[in-house]
Amino acid sequence: MPRYEPQEIESKWQKFWEKEGLFKTPQHSDLPKYYMLVMFPYPSGTLHVGHVKNYVIGDAVARYKRMRAYNVLHPFGYDAFGLPAENAAIERKIHPKDWTLNNINIIRRQIKKLGISYDWNREVITCLESYYKWTEWIFLKLYEAGLAYKKKAAVNWCPKCMTSLANEQVKDGRCERCDTPVTIKHLEQWFFKITDYAERLLKDLDKLTGWPEHVKTMQRNWIGESKGAKISFKVEESEMNIEVFTTRPDTLWGVTFMVLAPESDLVNHITLPELKGELEKFLNYVGQQDRHKRGSADVEKEGFFTGRYAINPVSGERIPIYVANYVLMEYGTGAVMGVPAHDQRDYEFAVKYNLPIKEVIKPSEDIPKNRAYDGPGIMVNSGPLNGTVVPEGIERVIQWLEERGIAKRSVQYKLRDWLISRQRYWGAPIPIVYCEKCGMVPVPEKSLPVQLPYDVEFLPTGQSPLMLNDEFRKTSCPKCGGPALRDADTMDTFVDSSWYFLRYVNPDRDDVPFVKEDVDHWLPVDQYVGGVEHAVLHLLYSRFITKVLYDLGYLSFDEPFENLFTQGMIYKDGAKMSKSKGNVVSPDEMIDRYGADTLRMYILFMGPPERDAEWNDAGIEGVYRFIRRAWSLMDQIISLPDNQNQVFAEEEKHLRRKLHISLRKVTQDMEGGFKFNTVVSSLMELVNDAYDYIDNLPQHRWNIKLLKELAKNFVLMISPFAPHFAEELWQRMGYSSSVMKEKWPEYDPDALVVEEVEIAIQVNGKLRDKVKIPVDATEDQIKEIALKSEKVRKYISDEPKKIIYVPKRLLNIIF
């Protein structure tokens, strides 16, 4: 057999797989289904080996499951709309569509060179009309259900990307895409009412037993459930009431002021007319502050007195109403009751503005005098509830307030509605028109898709580029036929990715986004693989859209992903791979040098796949040496003539035991989780064991039948990880079918039985000999064997005082 030439072998088998259609998944089968999905990429450039990691992981699982007799759905596509592709296109002065589709061609070629077993007949590209027609359809379904609405709102604005951002796309006050500090703009924007699903999104996390706990914790924290009470404060000399949400109703007797968020609609209504001019200056001043820093504990507290007072509903005391920078609309109702004795931010505000500080919880410990106390204690200065223990007494306080109509029990969430409007070109159009006569009108389903025009000046200006395109904008009203204008914003790309896993089931249907019977068969996804950075964005939005479609009757399941695996990153020189850092490792270069199978196996061998790993050139060289060594071993075995050796000598029994131990271990590691590194290690050990056998025996004593058994099972086991290598060897062994169509091998329990064991013989605790004994030997038989040993007898003088036997390990003779 010629030497290992990966480029020739891999090209040969990739053509074979494509010609035979081996990756194509039948829609219906008698086999159980298995939906294996990796998160699809943004095609904003070529792939590096960091991107490749999850594709290799997914393919190992898909190939293994096929061999375990599953009908495996393993599709691929491209998250082709959005800022990354658009910004890259702008930098290169090329149209986003041309840039994106060219990149898709490159990425597709890269992935095919890796031998990933995707069903390319199911490929989806979100920027094509055949896909975004149904993204628009989903928008209409939410609109019809009252879950899509438009309002003027203070939104996160990235001055570099020139577009609004959802809260989830802002990290530490900066745009997650370009790291630019985010500002605030007031714009008419479209929102999806994800807050209506906050409780279900939170509670149903408990159903996701196949998800990593840290991902569920991230979602729980983002949804941010708070249990407490809503309390109504009457505004003095007014019909107005201010509703406040608090998790500490037990501190109500300690309220000495009230604070409104600057963005609250109440501010203008409550402020005295003669103070409106000063108010406007204050609001403009606060508007220049970083809203995300405003919410931090260490921000300097600044306020403006509205001139009005509210009435404390339990004490009847007048409390001044302020507007303050440290209160945000994102929390509760945008109004906060100031309890300076028991909230540090309120304390700092009260000290600055000389407001009363009234203790109503007696601390259970000594505290500094210049700090608020927010721990447990006993209620004091609290009227009829004096002496109530906190926090146990909070429930009693709520009941007392409810009985008197002062408060009502409430659950609030930190989660805010999903802002989906983008003032950019490269996204799915929003299917809404505006008619002077009929107002806001949805585009009829039969008129979809609203096509994104090609000839557009798409450089970001802060205004939606489609606003300037009359050919796109000007249309007729679907209701009255009169002149109308299309909505000029496009949808957030996370809308596209919130349902793509459904489209893979019926990608060619142009009359429906998916067939219910088919998605109900294939979904939920059995195994989803992707980065943890999507825990709060894509994964949360996908769960929301799935629940909406379930409620509307389009799906029979309400969670999209049954099991989730989050892979670690691959670093180079201690940093995440990026072109700007010059530390990118190209998969094409690695494939040209070592072959795709070596690259695949090295990625899987780098360590536990959920952890980050450092790329090491010596590491891939080591895996390349292993594959060539395994190739040479298989070459020797394949060239041997068949024989019918039936009786196994001790050497054969040992090697056969090693083979079936490997089979059991590899199977357990594949079934028990993503332990690919230990799988590869087991395969390496098996090759070493085989070489130990053939190197220590003359060839005429080799048990050829055993070696052929080892070679066959080795090739089957390695095939999910090095599929081209396995196919070539399988063919050279004389098999006519693809190794992909073979069943996963089963280990032989009888081969694992150890007939003899070696035990240590000690005299007074010192090792004197090692002897082999039958595995079923009795203790007396073992003592007899030990006492007959020449190495032991020279240390024996008379009858032993004591003999200690540790079964199957050692015998200690004590004199």
Curated annotation (Swiss-Prot):
Domain of life: Bacteria
Predominant subcellular localization, coarse grouping: cytoplasm
Keywords: Aminoacyl-tRNA synthetase, ATP-binding, Cytoplasm, Ligase, Nucleotide-binding, Protein biosynthesis
Positions occupied by motif 'KMSKS' region: 576-580
Pfam families: Anticodon_1, tRNA-synt_1, tRNA-synt_1_2, tRNA-synt_1g
Compartments (UniProt record): Cytoplasm
SUPFAM superfamilies xrefs: Anticodon-binding domain of a subclass of class I aminoacyl-tRNA synthetases, Nucleotidylyl transferase, ValRS/IleRS/LeuRS editing domain
EC number assigned by the record: 6.1.1.4
Listed GO CC annotations: cytosol
A molecular function (GO) term: leucine-tRNA ligase activity
Motif ('HIGH' region): 41-51
A GO BP annotation: leucyl-tRNA aminoacylation
Binding locations of ATP: K579
Alphabetical list of InterPro entries matching this protein: aa-tRNA-synth_I_CS (IPR001412), aa-tRNA-synth_Ia (IPR002300), Leu-tRNA-ligase (IPR002302), Leu_tRNA-synth_edit (IPR025709), M/V/L/I-tRNA-synth_anticd-bd (IPR013155), Methionyl/Leucyl_tRNA_Synth (IPR015413), Rossmann-like_a/b/a_fold (IPR014729), tRNAsynth_Ia_anticodon-bd (IPR009080)
The reaction(s) this protein catalyses: tRNA(Leu) + L-leucine + ATP = L-leucyl-tRNA(Leu) + AMP + diphosphate
UniProt record similarity statement: Belongs to the class-I aminoacyl-tRNA synthetase family.
Protein name: Leucine--tRNA ligase
Taxonomic source organism: Pseudothermotoga lettingae (strain ATCC BAA-301 / DSM 14385 / NBRC 107922 / TMO) (Thermotoga lettingae)
